[in-house]
Amino acid sequence: MRVSVFAVGRMKSGPERELVERYFDRFAKAGPPLGLEFAGVSEIPESRGQTAQLRKAEEAQRIHEALDNAKSGGAKSGGTSSGGAALILLDERGKTLGSEAFAAIVGRMRDDGKRQLIVAIGGPDGHDPALRSRADLVLALGELTWPHQIARILIAEQLYRAATILAGHPYHRS
């Protein structure tokens, strides 16, 4: 299963970017024996719309287009079908999971035959309700609100951690 991260906004160079790249590199090396291939990060430009609602709708449209391209014949709305793409949205109002539960979900998506997993980090205004309804999972990284750069670091580390959990590697200590 190919794993992609879609992020609204750009990650500037600096220590945060280096840390994100380090964890994605680890995930890219740990994933293939488990059937997980890291396909990279796609940066989606922030909308310049006048209102939060318009900005969220424009950013959601860009994510919808990328998801439709990735699905290669899967369902167009209301979740995804077996063999298509799965969508996980990061959102402060999402479900809070532990690392082992997150790893189990990633493993189940892979085992169910999903060809692609897309993890989407929204813009400063969050995600459009239509995109939220389309997601297979809306996930919160805890109850705190995180800057987008830190959210990228956290999801990069959690994807790597999920791979190590699925592999039975001792990186994760429960």
From Swiss-Prot:
Subcellular localization, as worded in the UniProt entry: Cytoplasm
Keyword Glycoprotein: no
Main location: cytoplasm
InterPro entries (alphabetical): Alpha/beta_knot_MTases, RlmH-like, tRNA_m1G_MTases_N
An example Gene Ontology molecular-function term: rRNA (pseudouridine-N3-)-methyltransferase activity
Pfam families: SPOUT_MTase (PF02590)
Domain of life: Bacteria
UniProt KW Transferase keyword: yes
EC number: 2.1.1.177
Binding site for S-adenosyl-L-methionine: L90, G122, L141, G142, E143, L144, T145, W146
The entry's keywords: Cytoplasm, Methyltransferase, rRNA processing, S-adenosyl-L-methionine, Transferase
Main enzyme class: transferase
Catalysed conversion reaction: pseudouridine(1915) in 23S rRNA + S-adenosyl-L-methionine = N(3)-methylpseudouridine(1915) in 23S rRNA + S-adenosyl-L-homocysteine + H(+)
SUPFAM superfamilies per UniProt: alpha/beta knot (SSF75217)
Coiled-coil segments: none
Function of the protein: Specifically methylates the pseudouridine at position 1915 (m3Psi1915) in 23S rRNA.
Family in the record: Belongs to the RNA methyltransferase RlmH family.
NCBIfam families named among the record's database cross-references: PRK00103.2-3
HAMAP family: 23SrRNA_methyltr_H
Name the UniProt record assigns to this protein: Ribosomal RNA large subunit methyltransferase H
Protein source organism: Brucella melitensis biotype 2 (strain ATCC 23457)
Lineage: Bacteria, Pseudomonadati, Pseudomonadota, Alphaproteobacteria, Hyphomicrobiales
